[in-house]
Amino acid sequence: MNFKYKVLKFKKNKFENTDDLISIEEPLEISLRYKNQNKWLNNSLIITMRTPGHDKDLVRGFLYNEQIIQNINEIDNIESFGDKVGKYNIQNKILVTLNNSKNINIAKIKRDFMTNSSCGVCGKSSLDALEITKKEKTLNSDPKLTKEIISQSPSILRNNQSEFSKTGGINASGLFSTDGTLIT
């Protein structure tokens, strides 16, 4: 899911207002509705980060990969639920109902799934366990980086993360001092 944002870009030694295409990420809570000893139960499995748009495919793949299902026909229904939240008005919860031929012992399949992100969202078991607070910070002074330092920083980063040019899948950020030295 992509959105256009108005941004200020630095090009050819000057700033210009332009549109930029941004991919968004949102947390997704995956819950399971299943039978155990002929009783229907609901259980929250995991939270992961995703780019909204193909949530049902993501969930099917997750359940298959984790061997919760062995066949797509074991899923009776997948539905989004909960409030539409955030700037993009998105439902961030999915309930998967397994068909009644699948009798599950959740204790055998529930574990701490390995989904990680540096922001701390992935790996939580429910959205209720995740408290997101947004604190806006106002700068009290003008930026202290010169145009030259800003324009040199992408090439400095590229030189220090060689795997990105090979794979396109590993990227990083950098922290620079005000004189343009890459700190980390």
What is each PLM-predicted segment?
Residues 1-173, 178, 183-184:
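Intrinsically disordered, low-complexity regions enriched in acidic/Ser/Thr/Pro/Gln residues
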